[in-house]
Amino acid sequence: MSFIRGITPAAMILLEKAVETLTVVGDIRKYCEKERGKDTYWLTRDKLGQSELGKEILEALDIEFKWSNGFKDCIYSTAQLAPIIKAFCTDDKIKSCVEIIRNAEDKLRNPIAHTIVAVDNGMIKNRIGITAEELYNDVIKKVAESVRLMKKSTWNSYDEMNKLLIEKVREVK
């Protein structure tokens, strides 16, 4: 179940690409300040306020983070990318997938990331309502294909290779 631990980096790549390709926002980094000497980008109210689209993004983020008195400057993450997709993507299926991915991060990955705990499909389904296979096959693959990170044929070759590896491991046992 190391897949669950790796969901945040995968989600970042998927959501960045979704913002870039499936919304009018484009590259989120144009609304960021790059931290000197580091490869980190701070999404800032100042940068967002410099264009009409940026102001619309800021409004969506303020609504999302109203519980903490609105959006605050931060190194952007899936927590900021998801509401941008929600506000600017027209594909409801993608928005639903993004919500599931964020839910998996919040209710599954984040609580177990720094503890020693046995994770199985029962625990996963209990916390997020779907199994790891469903999360991977029905959600992550769909977003990756939609943002053209991977073609369906590529997934099929990975699936075929995984089946072959599983068969070989079983033969050795």
Q: What does each model-found stretch correspond to?
A:
Residues 61, 82, 151, 167-170:
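Residue-level marker of intrinsically disordered, low-complexity segments enriched
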Residues 70-86, 105-113, 170-173:
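Long, charged low-complexity terminal regions
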Residues 84-160:
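Charge-enriched, short contiguous segments at helix-coil
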Residues 159, 163-171:
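Conserved non-transmembrane functional hotspots
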